[in-house]
Amino acid sequence: MKEKLQQIKNTALEELNKISNKAELENIRVKYLGKKGELTQILRGMGKLSSQERPVIGKLANEVRGSIEELIEKAVTEIKLKEKEAKLKNEVIDISMPGRKQTVGRKNPLQLTLDSIMDIFISMGFSIEEGPEVEKDYYNFEALNIPKNHPARGEQDTFYINDDVVLRTQTSPIQVRTMENQKPPIKMIAPGKVYRSDSVDATHSPIFYQIEGLVIDKGITFADLKGTLELFTKKMFGEKMQTKFRPHHFPFTEPSAEMDATCFVCGGKGCNVCKNSGWIELLGCGMVHPDVLRNCGIDPEVYSGFAFGFGLDRMVMQKYELDDIRLLYESDMRFLNQF
């Protein structure tokens, strides 16, 4: 039995030294170590040996098995190395050949418009502030005068992470955090992505961009709000643009309004975009509610302020006469090359 085991070891070693590919290696493995392999059969027959022979032969058989497995592992490494060398040899790269022309991307109209808006507000003395998109319920609702069970919460289908954490439905939480962390005067805008539980169609998306602004100082009035927004509108769309304000209601501002602007497609003459009214709804705004100021540690008897906000996607769709919001998020170069 000892001689047979030694012969198996020597034969296996000899055969392993001659192999040149994985298939031959697998055949040798099966021949000696497979279910019906020569060494496997010997190990299965150990029970027929005497009690004196069994430990001696068992030890030798395991040593032979270990030697063969070690040789097979070494052979696998050598074969992989040879295959890699052969592949590298065959994959010769002619560095003198001209390279492939890379397609140059284009800025999305959302980003183009956002850049223009930020440049305008920076020129007006505003700072750009950012905040988390995964937000606490307190900052998204309660600090903005929207307590639990408030009717205004029903207007926004919210993605809840848990009872206290949401995907922000507006960039207003950035205003709250700014008021908490900075002392007045404050003059900032907060652009960013917001989330609503909407089904995707031509005019709705669960993710869209919003820009909100905030000014806090002593003696701020509604006249400051109107002047700021009228100046922004003229800088953004041209000196001929007109604006008008309509009373509205928001829980975080009082008084509140919506601002309409001359349709920038037809210039106020009437078209499909403005539904032949000559006006388009541009943004919501109002004087910051005293309770919101108190929630942020600002005394409403000393300071006042205004806030405003608008959806960037809607503005871009109106400006470029787009009929499908999905075009803004598909990264189709045929579409982007038009801007």
From Swiss-Prot:
Keywords: Aminoacyl-tRNA synthetase, ATP-binding, Cytoplasm, Ligase, Magnesium, Metal-binding, Nucleotide-binding, Protein biosynthesis. CDD domains: PheRS_alpha_core. One of its GO terms (molecular function) is transferase activity. InterPro entries: aa-tRNA-synth_II, aa-tRNA-synth_II/BPL/LPL, Phe-tRNA-synth_IIc_asu, Phe-tRNA_ligase_II_N, Phe_tRNA_ligase_alpha1_bac, Phenylalanyl-tRNA_Synthase, tRNA-bd_arm. GO terms for cellular component: cytoplasm. Its EC number is 6.1.1.20. One of its GO terms (biological process) is phenylalanyl-tRNA aminoacylation. It comes from the Bacteria. Binds 2 magnesium ions per tetramer. Its cofactor is Mg(2+). Its main location: cytoplasm. Mg(2+) binds at residue 254. It is found in: Cytoplasm. It catalyses: tRNA(Phe) + L-phenylalanine + ATP = L-phenylalanyl-tRNA(Phe) + AMP + diphosphate + H(+). The keyword Zinc-finger does not apply. Belongs to the class-II aminoacyl-tRNA synthetase family. Phe-tRNA synthetase alpha subunit type 1 subfamily. Tetramer of two alpha and two beta subunits. This is Phenylalanine--tRNA ligase alpha subunit. It comes from Clostridium novyi (strain NT). The gene is pheS.
